[in-house]
């Protein structure tokens, strides 16, 4: 396995395919780099170098007790980019990974970044507050935590067979393969790491990070996203990132990297080339 070690001694697994302009992918919760394989295979075949890492505590990376927070995730990404000495990189983040990309730019700037993309991403803020009335109430995230402690294997099955891919919608055609794929990745994450990450993706406010993004940015979101509702996320983020492009996928669920992979791949390629 290909890994590098962060300054705090955490081993981070990553895959690095192809050659050309580097495209870096940050994955969602509780998944890992494998969740981006459709996009990676497609873009590598188009002449790009594609890189994706397993966030600390997820997949094949180390499972440290501490450091399961967005600042550390962003710093891990920065160290990966520095380790590989990437320049002119395009950063794509899905769901929690979109927060990681935003926080990376907020903390480390865009000296090594050419463009960015937020896909079904959690910014600006998932949690409902007085300043963010369109967010989700704390009870939603407390429920996820409780379900994780009670039977996280079943939680991942329920998420994947229900709202994540939109399989709970009338007329939806479920895929047992997608459900198994989500579950397999989720169960590879450390339980403590995945548990802590719920707080990281739900309570981190990325508003100021988004305002610091000064490179061309693509925001992609499904208008049927039941996990990260579009109004308080994709639409709000696009309004905060100066000059961003918002693409709304009609009827698309949260997990559109799988359900709408061909459409997304084409849009990512056009954005990179544009």
Curated annotation (Swiss-Prot):
Its EC number is 1.11.1.-. The lineage of its organism: Bacteria, Pseudomonadati, Pseudomonadota, Gammaproteobacteria, Pseudomonadales. GO terms for molecular function: chloride peroxidase activity. Residues 22-254 form the AB hydrolase-1 domain. It is an enzyme of class 1 (oxidoreductase). The keyword Oxidoreductase applies. The active site is at 95, 225, 254. Keywords: Chloride, Oxidoreductase, Peroxidase. This is Non-heme chloroperoxidase. Belongs to the AB hydrolase superfamily. Bacterial non-heme haloperoxidase / perhydrolase family. It comes from the Bacteria. Homodimer.
